[in-house]
From Swiss-Prot:
Binding site for L-aspartate: 87, 182, 253
InterPro entries registered for this protein in UniProt: Asp/Orn_carbamoyltranf_P-bd, Asp/Orn_carbamoylTrfase, Asp/Orn_carbamoylTrfase_sf, Asp_carbamoyltransf, Asp_carbamoyltransf_Asp/Orn-bd
Keyword Lyase among record annotations: no
Pathway note: Pyrimidine metabolism; UMP biosynthesis via de novo pathway; (S)-dihydroorotate from bicarbonate: step 2/3
Organism of this sequence: Synechococcus sp. (strain CC9605)
Name of protein: Aspartate carbamoyltransferase catalytic subunit
A GO cellular component entry from the record: cytosol
Length: 349
């Protein structure tokens, strides 16, 4: 695992297909631990993982903390309501406090875009070896969610060999609030890297036309795309035109807390035009799964009966895949850091 190339995990745009394969392979192995009877591994014993969540979270925070504990790491949790932020302490100074207490990994979530990247840069400039893992920042990225969604789809399409090639040539439809979704952005990088064609569906106010070119060029700061040939991204306005031929459908929560202006006439009209139901899913054909990163607005993004139907809903499967996926990320980052420390000791001796 010493070949893992990422000191920090801040987005998925910099991931090669080999990087995705490394995460999926490990996550699949970790997912089988309860079956073998092993609940914990000593991989991160003696390491300290701090979860700095400046924004509310249920699934991401809980699964990162459980992932760290299953790898035998010590875990510290940060809560804004009981911190010194209310006294004027900066995000950087808060992070430095945890670094001073020995944190090896900071899992950072913040409502503002770019905070994990800035922390990683500032800590590195200070000579700190603590690594930063983005737990979701603003509208930018949610790497671990994109990876667990990838694992969920790969396991569905190829249960015996859930690797990136299971997505090659698949047509994945993502419906809803793309504009405000860091999950959608992470999935665009992940799915296209694995050769899937992604269809984005929603009203122009939530799915601007320029999203069709989202993965056409690497983002600023990344000199070149690590994926030689990506799947295509397209924008379709009507759900009945997007669903036929789909291999899987992901619907996204309407992020009303991020909508500064009136982008929808009503939730009822949104559900009428873009809400998923058993009837609508018949347009896809047989055995087409539905995903949702949660939390779900029942009766808005999809019907309650569809959400609760184990024959087609993979929502609980996504939750189950969260812990092993985040275990894989923590393991890879720790292995990379151990290799870097060994190299540093060797060069100084």
């Amino acid at each position: 695992m010493s070949g893992w190339p990422h000191r920090h995990v801040l987005d998925l745009a910099s991931f090669s297909r080999e990087d995705f394969a490394a995460v999926l392979e490990l996550a699949q192995r970790f997912r089988s631990l309860p079956i073998t009877g092993a609940r914990k591994l000593p991989a991160l014993q003696g390491r300290l993982v701090a979860t700095l969540f400046f924004e509310p979270s249920t699934r991401t925070r809980s699964s990162f903390e459980l992932a760290a504990k299953r790898l035998s790491a010590d875990v510290m949790s940060f809560s804004p309501s009981s911190s010194s932020l209310s006294k004027g302490e900066s995000v950087l100074d808060t992070a430095r406090t945890y670094v001073a207490m020995g944190a090896d990994v900071l899992v950072v979530r913040h409502r503002s875009t770019g905070v994990p990247q800035q922390l990683a840069h500032d800590l590195q400039q200070m000579g700190e070896r603590t690594v930063v893992l983005n737990g979701g920042d603003g509208l930018h990225s949610h790497p671990s969610q994109g990876l667990l969604d990838l694992l969920t789809l790969a396991r569905f399409f190829s249960p015996r060999h859930p690797m990136p090639e299971a997505l090659q040539g698949r047509r994945i439809v993502i419906v809803g609030d793309i504009l405000h979704s860091r999950v959608a952005r992470s999935n665009l990088w992940a799915l296209s890297a694995c050769g899937a064609d992604v269809v984005l569906c929603g009203p122009p106010s939530l799915v601007p036309d320029d999203f069709a070119a989202f993965v056409d060029a690497p983002p600023p700061g990344l000199p070149e795309d690590p994926v030689p040939q990506r799947g295509k991204v397209s924008v379709v306005r009507r759900l009945e035109h997007a669903l036929p031929g789909a291999d899987a459908v992901m619907t996204l929560r309407l992020q009303k807390e991020r909508m500064g202006q009136q982008l929808l006439t009503s939730l009822e009209r949104y559900h009428r035009d873009f809400g998923l139901s058993h009837e609508r899913m018949q347009l896809c054909g047989q055995n087409v799964p539905v995903l949702h990163p949660g939390p779900v607005n029942r009766g808005v993004e999809l019907s309650g009966s569809l959400l609760d139907d184990p024959r087609c809903s993979l929502v609980e499967e996504q939750v189950r895949n969260g812990v092993p996926t985040r275990m894989a990320l923590l393991y890879l980052m720790a292995a990379s850091e151990s290799a870097a420390e060994a190299s540093l000791v060797s060069s100084s001796s």
